[in-house]
Each structure stands twice: as C-alpha cells, then as structure tokens.
C-alpha cells in the first residue's frame, strides 16, 4: 500500500446557534456554571476538539450507510467508512459489525481532523461583549416536575452564535483509493444538517462550514519535487460540486 497524496481542507466553522461541548467538572465554584464547556488550558478560551467533529461525521455516515449494529461503530475493516475513519484493532467486541478476516484491514486511517480554535475576529468580538466571559455565554433553562410543577433551574455555558473557528482536515489517498474526499465532504454536509456537541435537539450546535479551501499535495510535494495545487476556494459546501470532489 503506497501513499499517493493528501487533500488539505481548511476553512471556518460558523456557529449558527449556541455551541456546547461539555467537559467534566472537577470543582464547585461560587457563581460557576452547572455545565461548563471545554477550554484551552492556556488561553482559557473555547475550542472544538477534532475528535468531536470526526466522531459526529462518522456516526452520521454510519447511519446513512446502515453500518451500525448494537449501537456500536462499524469494525469490519472493509467498508468505505472503516477505510476513511479507521477500524478498531480489537475485533472481539460484539458491538457493531466486526471484521471477519484479519487480512481485510483497510490500512492507515485516511482522515486527520485538527482541533478548531477561534478566529482572531471572534476573540475580539468576545472581548467587546459584556455578556461573554472567556468565550462563553450562560444559557438558563428550567426542568419542570410534571406533577408538582416545581422548577429546577440550571445553566449551561455555550459558545455564542456567530462565533467562528478555523478548521483543518487532512484526507490521505493510497493506492486503490478513489473517493475518500467525497466521503469526507458528504460527512461534513450531513453534519451541517445535524448538530455538533450537546443539547442539539433543543437548538444547540447548528454549524456551517464557510470559506473553504481545498489543496492537493502529491507525494512529490513531500519530497520537495513539486508544489501543491489549489482545487478551489468555496464560500460554502454547497459550492463544491461533484467535479471539484
């Protein structure tokens, strides 16, 4: 199996609604949030883990292609999802389709999803807003007892709508591969019509991929024998057609 090229997909993730990607709370703070969001430990600003993006894309594609069994991810090692997103080495689990032949492994994972960090423009907007603290707003909600109507108020931190994060996805192509880039773009489209993070059915987590650039770097690029080529600059995923893919 020989490496052929990488596709570099870059752009911005625009939060159309508030975004909540939670983190475990190790301490209780006076006036703190009941449900904090994940933050960069250095800057104390929110970011979007690459694992959150990749995991959501994979789960949506598995549902679309009927590759889910017993609630677990596909582990067959043969299908296009296993090829692009990788398959677990342990095939003994009963959750999800499993590989039946150890020689059927599809090789290295073809996708790398980097952590997405807020753009400089967004950081400045956060600083100027009196309602945003360390990149987050507090959303107050109530849980009502159906019998007594007693309210149980709580709050959640979330990244405010309109925030932008820079993203980068690398899609590799090896001998015999033909549609890795198409599968990744399909996963991104599915994600736009779903949600990222928690509380998505209550309006959180609607995102859009904007200002997308796709570059192609053949193996010769890494040997210093050739340059990269730009496949296109696109305002949105809707502008990327089959020919571009």
Curated annotation (Swiss-Prot):
It comes from the Archaea. Keywords: Antiviral defense, Endonuclease, Hydrolase, Nuclease, RNA-binding. Residues 88-110 are annotated as: Disordered. Its EC number is 3.1.-.-. GO terms for biological process: defense response to virus. It holds the Pfam family RAMPs. GO terms for molecular function: endonuclease activity; RNA binding. Transmembrane segments: none annotated. Part of the Csm effector complex that includes Cas10, Csm2, Csm3, Csm4 and Csm5. Encoded in a type III-A CRISPR locus. Belongs to the CRISPR-associated Csm3 family. CRISPR (clustered regularly interspaced short palindromic repeat) is an adaptive immune system that provides protection against mobile genetic elements (viruses, transposable elements and conjugative plasmids). CRISPR clusters contain spacers, sequences complementary to antecedent mobile elements, and target invading nucleic acids. CRISPR clusters are transcribed and processed into CRISPR RNA (crRNA). This subunit has the target ssRNA endonuclease activity; it cleaves multiple sites in the target RNA at 6 nucleotide intervals. This is CRISPR system Cms endoribonuclease Csm3. It comes from Methanothermobacter thermautotrophicus (strain ATCC 29096 / DSM 1053 / JCM 10044 / NBRC 100330 / Delta H) (Methanobacterium thermoautotrophicum). The lineage of its organism: Archaea, Methanobacteriati, Methanobacteriota, Methanomada group, Methanobacteria.
């Amino acid at each position: 199996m020989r490496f052929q090229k990488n596709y570099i997909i870059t752009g911005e993730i625009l939060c159309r609604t508030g975004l909540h990607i939670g983190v475990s709370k190790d301490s209780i703070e006076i006036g703190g949030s009941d449900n904090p969001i994940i933050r960069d430990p250095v800057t104390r600003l929110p970011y979007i883990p690459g694992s959150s993006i990749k995991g959501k894309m994979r789960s949506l594609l598995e549902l679309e292609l009927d590759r889910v069994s017993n609630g677990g991810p596909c582990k067959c090692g043969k299908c296009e999802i296993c090829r692009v997103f990788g398959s677990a080495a342990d095939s003994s689990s009963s959750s999800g389709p499993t590989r039946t032949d150890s020689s059927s492994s599809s090789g290295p994972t073809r996708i790398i999803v980097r952590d997405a960090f807020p753009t400089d423009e967004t950081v400045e907007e956060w600083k100027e807003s009196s309602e945003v603290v360390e990149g987050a707003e507090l959303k107050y909600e109530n849980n009502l007892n159906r019998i007594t109507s007693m309210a149980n108020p709580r709050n959640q931190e979330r990244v405010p709508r309109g925030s932008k994060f820079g993203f980068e996805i690398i899609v590799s192509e090896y001998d015999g591969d033909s549609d890795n880039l198409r599968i990744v773009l399909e996963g991104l489209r599915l994600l736009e019509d779903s949600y990222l993070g928690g509380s998505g059915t209550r309006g959180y987590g609607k995102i859009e991929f904007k200002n997308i650039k796709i570059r192609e770097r053949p193996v010769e690029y890494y040997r210093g024998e050739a340059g990269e080529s730009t496949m296109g600059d696109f305002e949105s995923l809707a502008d990327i057609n089959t020919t571009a893919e």
